[in-house]
Amino acid sequence: MGKLFGTDGVRGVFNEELTVELAYQLGRFGSHVLSEGSHNPKIVIGKDTRISGDPLEKALTEGIVSVGGDVILAGVIPTPAVAVIARELGADAGIVISASHNPYQFNGIKFFSGDGYKLSDDVENHIESFILEKKEVESHPTGTVTVLEHPEKIYLGHITKDFDCDFSGLKMVLDCAHGASYSIAPEFFVNGGAEVVTIGNKPDGKNINAGCGSTCLNVLCDAVVKEQADIGIAFDGDADRCLVVDEKGEIVDGDKLLHLIGVKMKKEGRLKKDTVVVTVMSNIGLDIALEKADCKTIKTAVGDRYVLEEMLNNGYNLGGEQSGHVILLDHNTTGDGMLTALVFLTLLKEDGRLASELSALMTSYPQVLVNAKVSNDKKKAYLSDEVIQLKISEVEKHFDGQGRVLIRPSGTEPLVRVMIEG
């Protein structure tokens, strides 16, 4: 990671760490780097529902057209849709304006390459060097700006091509986090024949992720029970992650989704190398459940970009995180909340059992996770702190091999996450 780019693009509080001036520079120099300065780049821009999305979109666009780039505006749309659209339209890049699950005060700018993958550290560092070293590029004739009509059709056409999308007989509650999926998701599932109750679908620019969505499931859990629904589906602000609530109002997290999807793919002969790629934060119960199905796990550092790197480098096609980032490389190049929901609902209908019965096929070990606020410059101080290291050793000795302590700095926020599992 550099000084500007974190684990998921450039992110910060709008008008503090992330300004319109920085957005202009990212648009200008990002376009230059991604087109290698050899042609007029074509770049797709999408965003979520944050109030700061419009000024950042305007600044990015101005930066891109200033080096002769042509901008295609996809409007409010899920992050994974931008990856699909960029690829389908033959663009040089896609840019998403979103801070994912963070509050509305934050925003972010994330690049996808023309083939729909997040940029490598080397490419991000190259873009960053232009900004930090105040480099310049040659002037070009001004590029063009086009508003893309019905971008959702391109996205949905791609992720649904291998599924029949018949949700008839299912009653579901959708929580769209007042974010990017607020319109596209309810319409999609209704068109598939489901009875849909939707919450979190009235964005006002400031309520994204506020007491709703995949990071705050209480309202959805209650709604599923109250509505006597078969299932609840929660997305985060940019809909690149998905979590599920069963008919009893209990959470089915990303680990359990990976278990169910992985076992199904294994039975169908589609799970490459019989392996699911997860992170060090995944529950021990996932390892045990997958082992019973003759599947293996490979663990990476926390962050879907590291999961994806492992998948691409070693030929795996399923991976993800407990938080609900699920990467299904047979269908998309990045974590995709709506795709994950589609795959799980297809599994649910084909299996015939209740969601709670499927969830019970994996037993999760108890985990306690605490977020400690720590300034960015001190997030790794625990590594050399003798008192902290001694306490970790004492706790793990007490578990006698049946538990662990994991401390990791957040890649997107001034936090250190402390997890105890056993």
PLM region spans:
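N-terminal small/polar loop signature for handling phosphorylated ligands or for N-terminal nucleophile
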Residues: 32, 36-107, 187-245
